[in-house]
Amino acid sequence: MQYEFLKNFPKRMKNVGLYGVLIQNSIQKTSWKQFGFLKFDEQMNLIFAVMLYIMEQSLREENCTMDDIGAYIDTINTRYLGKEISYDDCRKLGDFVVNVILSNEGRAMYFDGYDFEENDYHVMHISYVANRIVYLDQEVRRTSYYLTDDGYNLILSTLEIENNMK
């Protein structure tokens, strides 16, 4: 290969794709306006705050239901963000972030990354969150969310890896 620095290009593009697909899923959505999140910056901050919450719940091996996510958004909204939205709206906002933005409404997400060694594009699957059925008090059936490897890679690339390089 003439340019050695292009050797792991698909891996780099997978990381770029994690951001690209997330932004693409979020930027055109008008639903943000009904919750008072008009600026792209606000939207990205909330998405990552929700992802961090899901990660923390997973690391603690605790369930992370939509009720939990809604309560979390309500708490950070009341304490920090100050948007004029109700608890019910916070739950709807959580559902929007998790199921529309992060899960693409159940449709698979892909990003094409070029492989200079094979002279072709590689289609890379992207998935930020997954879910499983849990039973609360052995009776109530709920969906609990957790980050996938892609979700962890995205979150960890925002701070933890940079700190490890210092």
Residue ranges of model-derived segments:
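Positively charged, polyanion-binding regions of nucleic-acid-associated proteins
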Residues: 41-66, 95, 159, 165-166
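Long, contiguous hydrophobic alpha-helical segments, chiefly transmembrane helices and signal peptides
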Residues: 47, 51, 69, 145-151
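DNA-recognition alpha helix
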Residues: 65-82
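Short amphipathic alpha-helical boundary/capping segments
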Residues: 37-38
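Charged low-complexity interaction tracts in eukaryotic proteins
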Residues: 3-33, 91-160
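Short, glycine/acidic-rich hinge or "gate" loops at secondary-structure transitions
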Residues: 66, 84-91
